[in-house]
């Protein structure tokens, strides 16, 4: 099992290769990354048998930026019929697994395998359980089968607490009809990724206040309002009337880069289309100067050197806070609902909660 297989957004295979190569160098794992453009996946082939496992044990998956999912394992060829027997034969080299996910890459060809995987999963699950290779136990490794075609599959392992929350890293979120734009799903996904679900009632509740910079028409504002927050929406464009009718939104026509609240707020969110360095500087200012305790900000990516630019900005933010003696939690992820961008989350750890409204 010397191969680490990773899913990603189509077109970002190179960023995954750069990021995982950085990780391998940091952990002294020898090998090489490879990927084909627009295939929505990448591999890191280790020269040592335990290399892929060392990569996974040395890194929290949630802290990676561009991979959507990962697993360590092997590629196997499948016959046209009796695929299950071949998979069971290879399971001799795998431990007892606690769950099973069948996956496919996020391409048109991959999506065509969706129906096959749905039909095949039930039969495979029964066979694995009958063979004593699968039980229901979240503490045991997850068996991840990524089908490249009906004839080729990557058989992989990942720990359920150190891999994607959803198959292929694609969230199953339902678009709320009341929300004024589909961008609302981006903020909801960010919360799922950056905030443990059992902390939502503590960190996203109705006694809080928030600011949405570049708010119109209100996709992100809707998420804050849906949690019961009192929101100041900053945008020169119009907000959805349905949001204004809630009585929880104050709309100010102002520049999102110059506006500052008179009193600290709990949350600042921003999806303004601007150069990533400018949005990163604004994020650092809001958290560093105490204008908010938590923030979610999108960084639009350049055409080239995208991983290098994100890494540079994150290091600049971290170094800035360290120099000022400010304790923060920094996260960054290319979410499923992101396009040519990444989503950053910052949480200040050394300030008291603002007074309730």
Task: List the predicted regions and their residue ranges.
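SAM-dependent transferase fold signal centered on methyltransferase-like domains
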Residues: 1-357
């Amino acid at each position: 099992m010397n191969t680490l297989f990773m899913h990603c957004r189509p077109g970002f295979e190179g960023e995954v290769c750069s990021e995982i190569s950085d990780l391998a160098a940091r952990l002294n794992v020898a090998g090489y990354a490879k990927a084909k453009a627009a295939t929505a996946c990448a591999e890191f082939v280790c020269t040592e048998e335990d290399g892929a496992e060392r990569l996974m044990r040395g890194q929290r998956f949630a802290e990676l930026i561009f991979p959507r999912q990962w697993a360590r394992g092997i590629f196997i060829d499948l016959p046209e019929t009796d695929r299950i027997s071949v998979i069971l034969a290879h399971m001799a080299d795998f431990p007892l697994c606690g769950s099973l996910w069948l996956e496919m890459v996020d391409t048109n060809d991959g999506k065509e395998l969706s129906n096959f995987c749905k039909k095949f999963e039930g039969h495979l699950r029964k066979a694995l359980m009958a063979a004593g290779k699968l039980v229901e136990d979240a503490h045991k490794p997850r068996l991840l089968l990524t089908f490249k075609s009906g004839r080729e599959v990557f058989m992989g392992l990942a720990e359920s607490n150190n891999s994607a929350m959803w198959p292929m890293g694609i969230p199953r979120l339902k678009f709320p009809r009341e929300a004024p734009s589909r961008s609302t799903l981006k903020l909801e996904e960010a919360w799922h990724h950056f905030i443990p679900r059992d902390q939502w009632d503590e960190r996203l509740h109705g006694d809080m206040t928030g600011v949405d910079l570049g708010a119109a028409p209100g996709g992100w504002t809707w998420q804050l309002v849906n949690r019961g927050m009192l929101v100041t929406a900053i945008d020169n464009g119009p907000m959805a009337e349905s949001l204004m009718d809630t009585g929880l939104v104050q709309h100010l026509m102002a520049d999102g880069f110059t506006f500052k609240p008179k009193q600290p707020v709990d949350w600042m969110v921003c999806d303004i289309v601007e150069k990533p360095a400018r949005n990163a500087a604004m994020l650092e200012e809001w958290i560093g100067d105490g204008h908010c305790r938590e923030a979610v900000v999108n960084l639009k990516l350049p055409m080239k050197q995208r991983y290098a630019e994100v890494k540079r900005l994150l290091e600049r933010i971290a170094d800035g806070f360290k120099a000022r003696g400010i304790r923060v939690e920094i996260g960054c992820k290319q979410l499923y609902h992101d396009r040519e961008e990444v989503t950053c989350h910052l949480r200040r750890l050394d300030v008291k909660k603002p007074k309730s409204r």
